[in-house]
Amino acid sequence: MGIDERATSLPPGAMRGAIVGTVALITVFAAASAPIPLYATWQQQLGLSASDVSMTIVMYLFGVLSVLFFAGSLSDASGRRPTVGAALACGVAGCLLFIGLSSGPMLQFARFVQGVSCALSMSATSAFVIDCASERHRTFGMTIASTGYLIGLTVGSLGIG
């Protein structure tokens, strides 16, 4: 399908999908960066060692990399919307784990879940935003797809104060 055909074949609510995808992308990454400034507090409250905190970072990276390596094209097979939904569900689950945080392993698992959420969002939500953007707003879609996660990381880190 050519660019001209794509511009006329988008459903009427496609731009709304691009906006929803943008909000989802920024939200997932804001939620993932919000816990980082709290590591020192949790280290003191939970009695974590420096290596426990380091392992928390490793678990996040393991979550991201495992999804990108083994399920990076998941949204191509199952569709963008279900994969974006899974990314949001993992993001919510990660946040809920932080609410009841009581141990180092729980902190590490919460960060792993957030890593999975971010990886799913990186691939599927970015593609969803681009797919939904009309030709007139294609630059917007591509800009959000490439910078939305950075905006989310900034918002989350600043938001936690």
Regions found by a protein language model. Give the residues of each.
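Pair of pore-lining "gating" transmembrane helices in MFS-fold secondary transporters
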Residues: 11-44
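Small-residue-rich segments within alpha-helical transmembrane domains of MFS-like 12-TM solute carriers
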Residues: 29, 33, 99, 115-123, ...
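Small-residue (Gly/Pro/Ala) motifs that create kinks and tight helix-helix packing interfaces
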Residues: 39, 152-161
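Helix-breaking motifs and short loop linkers at transmembrane-helix boundaries and internal kinks
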Residues: 47, 79, 100-106
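Central cavity-lining transmembrane alpha-helices of secondary-active solute carriers
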Residues: 55-72, 122
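Structural signature of the two symmetry-related core transmembrane helices
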Residues: 82-97
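Paired small-residue
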Residues: 94, 105-114
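Cytoplasmic helix-loop-helix junction between adjacent transmembrane helices
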Residues: 112-148
